[in-house]
């Protein structure tokens, strides 16, 4: 028989219960995503400050919208600064479409990432099987779905660009490009990393390898940056032999998308394409200690599982993947990330016959 809790213990139990309810809430994340999808903050900033005006702008029912707005006030994203009139708080202003943090797009349920977050509703399935659940929700694997939906592909590329552009100067500055003539950026998106290298090292040329849906975007970006004469873009598949050899091969935010066996296949293709003395540079989220319980690390790690079957990796994992591809982790450089809320690292891999 369980002892009756003491009166003194009950407040602690109530606090614990409130914490659990808050952590287990599904409605609050969906309220935030709905506000982003409806562009509520943009409409408010444009002058639609009442429920009636917002309902007209968003094609929603006023009585239902009021319920949503009440919860947005309760969680601190909106405030009622005059009777019946609402304004965004400092946190709520992050959901403005033109805010540099781009959080509205990240939370918009019509765009690639927030839409993919619905895969978390089948997390038990992913934990039991170790496989992604995106396909069971949407009928196709993540990248195949993007390939058939140009709108999703464009939103995904845009989201990655706004999240990662701020991080490219640091890895470009962290590596010595003196003896590098050509860089191959594998899965390089619109070419932001290759562009950062080209600006820093004028003697270096580069190739960006990407899927068909991103090639035109990358070419346009590099043309606008005035770098198309030094950085070219080719369509290709990094599971096949790479289109050319290089002194440095970049994998920026690529391997976290893939399970270990596929990550080894990608690394093996990269190793095959290295010029003598060349190096593979892996640019990813930094947490190289085993048994990491960091909240941001574990959240992204689970996201990679349910979206793609991929994973974030500790230093021990990187050593194992490198060895399986005939490589060795030669160096790990921690990178400053003043504008994004997590740390990044640059891992330098060398052929096992020459690495440290």
Swiss-Prot record:
Substrate binds at residues 163, 257, 303. Its EC number is 2.1.1.292. CDD domains: AdoMet_MTases. The keyword Transferase applies. InterPro entries: COMT-like (IPR016461), O_MeTrfase_dom (IPR001077), Plant_O-MeTrfase_dimerisation (IPR012967), SAM-dependent_MTases_sf (IPR029063), WH-like_DNA-bd_sf (IPR036388), WH_DNA-bd_sf (IPR036390). Optimum pH is 8 and the values at pH 7.5 and 7.0 result in 60% and 80% decreases in activity, respectively. No pH values above pH 8.0. It catalyses: carminomycin + S-adenosyl-L-methionine = daunorubicin + S-adenosyl-L-homocysteine + H(+). GO terms for molecular function: methyltransferase activity; O-methyltransferase activity; protein dimerization activity. Pfam families: Dimerisation, Methyltransf_2. One of its GO terms (biological process) is daunorubicin biosynthetic process. Keywords: Antibiotic biosynthesis, Methyltransferase, S-adenosyl-L-methionine, Transferase. Pathway: Antibiotic biosynthesis; daunorubicin biosynthesis; Antibiotic biosynthesis; carminomycin biosynthesis. Optimum temperature is 37 degrees Celsius with about 10% decrease in activity at 30 and 45 degrees Celsius. Homodimer and homotetramer in equilibrium. This is Carminomycin 4-O-methyltransferase DauK. It comes from Streptomyces sp. (strain C5).
